Amino acid sequence: MKTEKQLARAYGELAQRLTGKRFLTASGLTRKEAAALLNREVWLEKLGRVLPIRRRVLCADVLELCRPEMERLAGSEQPEKGWLVYIYGTTSRILYPDLGPRPEDGRCRAAALFYLEVLRLVLDYEREALPFDPAYDFAFLSQEEFSGCTQAEEYRRFLEDWREQHIYQLLRLGNEATPFSTLSHIAGVHYVAMAAARGLAAAGVPVDLALVSGAAAGHDLGKYGCKPGERVPYLHYFYTDQWFTHMGLPVISHIAANHSTGDLEPENLTVESLLLIYADFRSKQERGPDGREVTRIYGLDDSFQIILSKLDNVDAKKLRRYQFVYARLHDFEDYMRSLGVDVDLTGHPAPVKELPSVVLRSNRHSSGYLRLNSASLRFRSALKV
């Protein structure tokens, strides 16, 4: 009975979405055409193949659920490189229309938008059913949590844009339609940044959690705006800023688009900027045996070595710059540790370590105290704590 209720609820949500004004306007379908895709018995059976969810959903499996309706919509127009690649490109163009039209657009686009609505529904149920995974999931702030933040209104609109522009579906599609794993990197950055931000907030440091969350989740969206032949590592910052600015989110954009290690050089960075750069530094990607990207969250020391191993034409000047970045992030991490922030991601606040009485301190204790106190004073001054 519970499964039957879930299926009926899921079907009702899908029907409401596909006959709503937003979908009809985007797809160019009439309400009658959309309703013709929603045979109740057919879709209750289809949804019953995936609900209740017990494992990670594959975009390819959802495609098979939708294929008959999609092919009916597309008619003789079929994507040259297959549906998943086409839908991935369609979703990228929702964020970045300047990528331009493709020959298959038209009825194929309506089919892709239909698929995206079904995928969104299934992924919503996946999030409800499965344990949180920092490589896949985003623990966005609830309205109650962000209502007191300075950037509450921008964050509310960011969450709306994230959902309406199918950004999470785009990230999941990228896992299967490309050899890249942008999802796990972005999700990992968001996880690290928010764990640290919450710890700082609990310790009394003024930090805008909404600003950190929006910037961390959106910091690499510009990768989807890069055109063939463009150098993604250099230009994605520009396209990230372009998307946020176009959506009217300038404050989040300023943090999200300025997350390179070079942005650490100005002395007075906001705590939100430091958190994003720190989290991005720790979430690193490597190639697995099959050539696909694998993302892991490393400690600062390991991340620094990985970065050095990937640098081209490392001269003394470039090495000094990265050593400076590493040292500054290390000071920031030490400062967070001194406040009990869970930088090791154990899920529990770290105990604040107290030094022995002055008369009992060893030379090691004293030198460590001086270094930590110096970093603490510097960050407290910079962050106006």
How does the language model describe each region?
Residues 252-253, 316:
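Short, surface-exposed acidic
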Residues 169-175, 218-222:
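A short, surface-exposed helix-loop junction/capping segment
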Residues 152-171:
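Short alpha-helical hairpin
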Residues 189, 207-247, 253-263, 280:
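His-Asp-centered metal-binding catalytic motifs of divalent-metal-dependent phosphohydrolases/nucleases
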Residues 2-154, 177-207, 218, 228, ...:
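Divalent metal-dependent phosphate-bond-processing catalytic cores, especially two-metal-ion Mg2+/Mn2+ enzymes
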